[in-house]
Amino acid sequence: MDLKARIRRRQRGGVDARLVLDYDAISPVAHVEEPVGRGPVLELLLDYLDPVFTGDLPPDAYVWGPAGTGKSAVVTALFDGLRSQLARSGSVIHTSTRAASATEEVPEFVYVDGREARSDFALYHAVLDRLLDERVPEKGVGTDTLRKKLREALRPLSEKLVVAVDHVGEPDGPTLADVRERFEPVDDSVAWIVVGRTPPGDLKVDLPPERIEVPAYRDHALVDILTSRASDGLAQRALGHEQSREIATWAEGNAHDALAALFGAADHATAENHQRIQNDDLTNGIMDVPRPSASLGRVLALPPNRQRVLRALVELPERDRQSVDSATDAIVNSPRIDLSAGTVKRFVYELAEAGIVERVREDSTNGHGRPPSRVEPCFATRVFRRLHDLQQGER
């Protein structure tokens, strides 16, 4: 934590001191500028990217590792750092709308979240939006137009581009083969990095020449992450060292789940008017995170109408979730919802197919037909509730 952050903490301390000072600082979907415990991985990525410092492109690459290993945090921090450092040194890309100003050209770096750029159109739009100074239209143009615009942006001065496409291989998202196909028309000017979870040996596609593994965190690294985040986002001494160790041991190398448990514990403590996180707060925070857990980043990247359905779902008592029909009826009656019962039911089935919720088959049928399916969220509901409400301007 830097000096300014320390001073702000002192300013906020006092009679009305809050337990949670900054929800973003402890959020499992927020990334920090300097990822904790990932120095060796950053060095591997810098070794891979070494050709860019002489103006060349590296080979295409696959960065992989299990959930919660900090892949997104590392790649976003690295790309932000490269853009910042290279811009200060005067090495910038030239485009059709940006004046040439550098004698030594290096590739531009673009990060794309596959959760938000699932189609060809969305991917090209995300890249062009970062690459060009001019506004890229979202409507009234087709995918072919954007593909042509990307070729034109890269062609005039033999410009080069390194694109990282994150969260590849998730349900409804792009695959590695999709990324390769989408950049094939400009493969002489683009090096792509695909970031995903699937081990290379389990992929049934031709793999890029470079593969970089991001292993699960060790317990001591998770403790450091939790301590750092708590230092930035919570009141002083709100989280004890033994509590950090308990979360880290439970999370088994998964920083997403560890931070979700911390967030849930802090939120529970706030609701109970505790000045520090108590053992019952910690227990509630841990119990709120299913194992395995759907990433909250996936949930919060869903379209707003589906998020509203989930927000209504997490408020339902268990008796209203005993079947898809009963859950649908209860959701439709929520003041948050202005959708028809048919639309809500379709959303519930789609969310179940995507692994966001689960339809749990009941054992008893009473001898009549198929047993009903209880609807259970597959994500940390307390954390989602708070993050969703904060996004909507609610407290």
Q: Where does each model-flagged region fall?
A:
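Alpha-helical sensor/transducer elements of the RecA-like P-loop NTPase core
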Residues: 209-228
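Walker A/P-loop nucleotide-binding motif
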Residues: 57-77
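A short, basic N-terminal segment
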Residues: 1-57, 81-84
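Mid-core helix/loop region of P-loop NTP-binding domains shared across ATPases and GTPases
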Residues: 94-106, 116-178, 182-195, 199-206, ...
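Short acidic, hydrophobic short linear motifs in intrinsically disordered regions
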Residues: 319-331
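The feature captures the helix immediately C-terminal to the Walker
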Residues: 76, 80, 259-263
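Conserved alpha/beta core segments of nucleic-acid transaction machinery
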Residues: 272-314
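Terminal-proximal interaction/regulatory segments of ATP-powered molecular machines
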Residues: 329-395
